[in-house]
């Protein structure tokens, strides 16, 4: 039995407004926006299943939320470097607009810089939060799988092979597939 539960959470945005003095002695405000995952522990809704008289605990195979958070953490140094390069480039554009457009150009460039700074919050939103597995040996024939708060799943185990029961549980959505391997 393989079960997907929940969805990977979406990324949030952390914005830091930094007052920095330029080489000319002027104070400027710069924005730094980074994607973050808020600390939300995932609690699976299904922890065990029953087949006949057997109760089988589900063992987590992978927690994709943890993989997503680890990937984001590993990408942070490169993201910070890119953000610093963007700030330098935006400051160059602002300085040129201030030179050519005076105070109006300077104000417009600063407003654009503050408004345009957004973190890349694209996420793994369509992936399950956790994938778990349960294994057991059954005799050939008809069996019933029971889950809390779900309809029973009737399936047949053939004499020659394996039977995979693939379950998806996301919020109020539930689906099952039985595959003879």
Q: What is each stretch, according to the model?
A:
Residues 1-181:
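Short loop/turn and low-complexity linker motifs enriched in small/turn-promoting residues
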């Amino acid at each position: 039995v393989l079960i997907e539960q929940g969805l990977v959470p979406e990324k949030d945005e952390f914005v830091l407004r930094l007052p920095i003095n330029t080489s000319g002695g002027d104070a400027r405000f710069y924005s730094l926006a980074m994607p973050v995952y808020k600390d939300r522990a995932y609690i699976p809704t299904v922890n065990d299943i029953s087949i006949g008289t057997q109760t089988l605990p589900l063992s987590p195979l992978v927690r994709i939320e943890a993989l997503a958070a680890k990937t984001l953490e590993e990408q942070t140094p490169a993201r910070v470097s890119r953000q610093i390069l963007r700030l330098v480039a935006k400051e160059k554009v602002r300085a040129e607009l201030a030179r050519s457009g005076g105070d109006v150009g300077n104000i417009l460039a600063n407003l654009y810089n503050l408004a345009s700074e957004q973190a890349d919050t694209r996420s793994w939103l369509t992936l399950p939060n956790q994938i778990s597995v349960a294994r057991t040996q059954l005799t050939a024939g008809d069996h019933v799988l029971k889950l809390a708060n779900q309809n029973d799943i009737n399936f047949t185990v053939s004499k020659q092979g394996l039977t995979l029961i693939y379950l998806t549980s996301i919020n109020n959505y539930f689906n099952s597939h039985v595959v003879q391997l």
